[in-house]
């Protein structure tokens, strides 16, 4: 709606700020059931070039970049101890506050520089910068790893160096047969596709023993 035109056809309309505000409130109200975990979380958004291509669940105009920003904001607004970062082939500075409207968040994420995809970076960054995290939540698409160290190895290195049994949740916004998590490690989980139940499932996984 905020773009003032449809993805299909030639329909156009005047964007009304009050409607944008109402849609924003409705989006967050839909996730009121998501409860905070009380854990320390690093929330990482993949901003690589492939995140701006294709569509999610056959919805025209809903790219992995838009979908991941929307879902990540649920966790960002719900949790009190959360650090939001962005990455591609390197860590990318991101300036987003909890009180920003969803359309503004999507716009800011869309303006970040593109690059490759290295899903190990959030763990390596946290280790290098002495960030204590009980869980890493990574939103990406189907291109999940193109770095020098596998994300599983990066998480294990973080656990070993910090002594924190951190968990890893990787959300692949585009459904395919990807897998990053070690199936033998109960502290890792892959989530595939765009699902409104994901934030609640992720919260339950983080607090589970």
What does each model-identified segment do?
Residues 1-209:
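Acidic, glycine-rich A-domain
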């Amino acid at each position: 709606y905020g773009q003032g035109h449809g993805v299909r056809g030639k329909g156009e309309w005047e964007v009304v700020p009050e409607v944008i505000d109402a849609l924003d409130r409705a989006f967050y109200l839909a996730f009121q059931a998501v409860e905070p975990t009380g854990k320390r979380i690093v929330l990482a958004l993949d901003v690589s070039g492939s995140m701006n291509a294709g569509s999610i669940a056959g919805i025209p105009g809903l790219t992995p970049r838009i979908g991941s920003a929307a879902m990540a904001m649920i966790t960002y607004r719900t949790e009190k101890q959360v650090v939001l970062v962005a990455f591609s082939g390197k860590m990318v500075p991101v300036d987003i506050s909890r009180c920003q409207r969803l359309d503004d968040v999507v716009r800011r994420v869309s303006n970040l520089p593109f690059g490759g995809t290295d899903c190990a970076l959030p763990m390596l960054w946290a280790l290098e910068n002495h960030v204590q995290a009980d869980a890493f939540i990574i939103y990406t698409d189907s291109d999940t790893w193109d770095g020098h160290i596998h994300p599983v190895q990066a998480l294990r290195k973080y656990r070993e160096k910090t002594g924190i049994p951190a968990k890893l949740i990787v959300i692949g916004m585009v459904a395919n047969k990807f897998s990053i998590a070690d199936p033998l490690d109960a502290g890792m989980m892959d989530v595939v596709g765009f699902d409104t139940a994901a934030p609640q499932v992720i919260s339950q996984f983080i607090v589970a023993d």
